[in-house]
Every structure is written in structure tokens, then in C-alpha cells.
Amino acid sequence: MLPIITYLDLETTGATPLRDRITEIALVRFENGIEVARWQTLVNPEKSIPAFIQQLTGIDNEMVANAPTFKEVPGILAKYLDGAVMVAHNVRFDHGFLKSEYRRLGHVLRQRVLCTVKISRSL
């Protein structure tokens, strides 16, 4: 039996989880090697997105103005992350942002993680 894996990618307002915020979340969950669910949403960071980040990600303030804030998404995230190994390219970045967002809500995120950057460097 294969582990449950959720692939995650985030876009953010910058590189510092304590100061910056998530602007987009994309997830794909696999169970026994089969894709069972996928989800993507823009997230209102409740702060302005710097111009260079807008150019980098293509996400601007207008696009996120009516998007859910992070406090509206943990229930959905749980459906993808519970019981799964979270896989991301440079997982420290994505995991750090998720942990910071959960901390702002008074919660703790405990998640098993796997980094594709580390895997690729070992090949």
C-alpha cells in the first residue's frame, strides 16, 4: 500500500513567513497512487502585494480582493493534508508559510513533509 501524498504549491506576498502572507494555494491528493482530489484557490492576504511579486506570480491585488482569507480555508486544507505526506518543491518555504498562517489563527500545524529539492539534489 502506498502512502497518501498531497502535492502542494503556494504563492505568497514575499519570502518571509512571519511578515508575508499566502496569495494562492494549489493541492493534489493521491491515495494508493491514484489522484483522488485537487483544489486551487486564490487567498486574500489582507495586505498589498508588492509590484515585483505581482510581476513574478501574475497575481495582483484586484485578483485577491474578493478571495477567501486564510482563516476560511483550514477546513478544506485538512481534507487534503490529514493523514498525508505533504510534498513540495522547497517544502521549507511552503510548510513555513502554512505553519505561520495556522499560528496566526491560534493553531499548530503538524505535517509530515517531503522536499523534492532535496530529492533532486541527491540524484
Model-derived regions, located:
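Short alpha-helix plus adjacent loop in nuclease-associated cores
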Residues: 100-103, 113-123
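Conserved non-catalytic scaffold segment of RNase H-like nuclease domains
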Residues: 1-111
